[in-house]
A protein has these predicted regions:
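SAM/dcSAM-binding transferase cores
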Residues: 129-196
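Class I SAM-dependent methyltransferase "Motif I" SAM/SAH-binding loop
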Residues: 1-4
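Conserved SAM/SAH-binding beta-strand->alpha-helix loop
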Residues: 26
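Conserved beta-strand signature within the Rossmann-like core of class I S-adenosyl-L-methionine
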Residues: 101-108
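A short acidic, Gly/Pro-enriched loop at the edge of an enzyme's catalytic core
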Residues: 57-66, 71
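S-adenosyl-L-methionine
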Residues: 35-61
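A short glycine-rich, Lys/Arg-flanked "PGG" loop and its adjoining helix->strand segment in the class I
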Residues: 86-100
């Protein structure tokens, strides 16, 4: 979900030769990004108001080069794990529109979502290209990671760190969703007890 569209606008400014589409269900949030893109006369940015589950209805097979997931709701409760935008349920949707070797970026302030995404990567044979548990502590930061969103500035998770992971999907994700859910019940419950 693109939220206020800061990432779409930022990437559009950095890469005027590429097209960017921000997707979110809430039109009032996207309006801010759309207005900013119009004000800056950025013709390579569009916004689509829809649910993420509907992506394959709007994009064809192999149509998307990259997907940026920036500061999504981490859905902290184990019972809501299937709503995490890096859950295999969503990764299978992304496979339908991503080009072969296309990449997915996750930038978050949630250590919980970052750990979950790494767990999913390990379990499902996903190729992690880059992973960082403190973006701004790096000596060199890729310019695409310097774009700040409204939600990043709020640091909702209170972690004072920004986590990043970039990965590409295999041709097929194994059917391990039940196994993942059972593992989450054990590990996330243990982490909650430890964190108290």
């Amino acid at each position: 979900a693109c939220g206020r569209g800061e990432y779409a606008v930022g990437l559009g400014e950095m890469f005027p030769e590429n097209n960017f589409i921000g997707v979110d269900i809430k039109g009032n949030r996207m309006y801010l990004g759309a207005k900013k893109a119009l004000d800056k006369q950025l013709n390579n940015i569009r916004f689509l108001r829809t649910q993420i589950e509907m992506l394959p209805d709007y994009f064809g097979k192999d149509e998307v080069d990259e997907i940026w997931i920036t500061f999504p709701d981490p859905q902290l409760r184990t019972s809501k794990a299937k709503k995490r935008l890096t859950h295999p349920r969503f990764l299978r949707l992304y496979q339908k529109v991503l080009k072969k070797n296309g990449v997915i970026h996750l930038k978050t302030d949630s250590p919980h979502l970052f750990r979950f995404t790494k767990l999913v990567s390990d379990m499902y044979g996903i190729s992690v290209i880059e992973s960082c548990d403190n973006v701004y502590a790096q000596s060199e930061i890729d310019k695409t990671l310097t774009i700040k969103t409204h939600y990043e500035s709020l640091d909702i998770a209170g972690s004072n760190k920004i986590f990043y992971i970039k990965f590409s999907l295999p041709d097929t994700l194994p059917e391990k969703d039940d196994e993942l859910q059972e593992l989450l019940k054990t590990t996330e419950t243990n982490q909650e007890i430890t964190n108290q």
